[in-house]
């Protein structure tokens, strides 16, 4: 995903959960099936979307949100970070935050 594509989504009015990851990161690999499941759950949701950003492929996006470690999960609404989870976590934690923040 290019920075331009990301900006368009970030400014869309939807709540965006961004999974910042790296291919060399063990905890990131552990989170992949959880993120895929959440991504599928919100695929048709008009108020929320899940994106994954490889920090090595596009370092400008994580830099914008001061991402210093992976995995990091940043919730973005109207182009601004509204919540962050750093490190591996549970599906329930990520989904509960989506539901709370997308309203």
PLM regions with names:
Residues 1-15, 59:
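A short beta-strand-turn-helix
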Residues 17-18, 50, 73:
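Hydrophobic beta-strand anchors of alpha/beta hydrolase catalytic cores
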Residues 25-28, 73:
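The canonical Cys-X-X-Cys-His
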Residues 74-103:
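Non-catalytic, surface beta->alpha helical segment in thiol-disulfide oxidoreductase systems
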